[in-house]
Amino acid sequence: SLYTYLLTAFVLLLHRNARQQEYIVGMPIAARLTKEQEHMIAPLVNVLPLRLPLDEAASFSELVQTIRGILFAAFRHQRLEFTDIVRAVNVDRSAGHFPIYQCMFQLDNMPLASPTLNGVN
């Protein structure tokens, strides 16, 4: 999907600057998991940390396939609350940054409304 390709490109951009072998990127997902929540007017969002390895010897296509598998696994666990993940990992907390990831990747796929101006098409 477009998201997978763009996330792969984002990780490569991170790698260009940081030169790490692994990145943890936050992925916001809609947390409307029940019928009752679908009609609520509220931002129901959960953030899943994605542990994304980067193999410098891999081709772009191979990286896309690796990240695709990680995304499918993340969606299977989307009911996990972020606070539960933080407790399970037991990382040191700091007011200066999020406990598990320091960057997020989000793709808005909502169609944009075209502005309407008098006399302009």
Give short role names for the model-derived ranges:
Residues 1-121:
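Adenylate-forming
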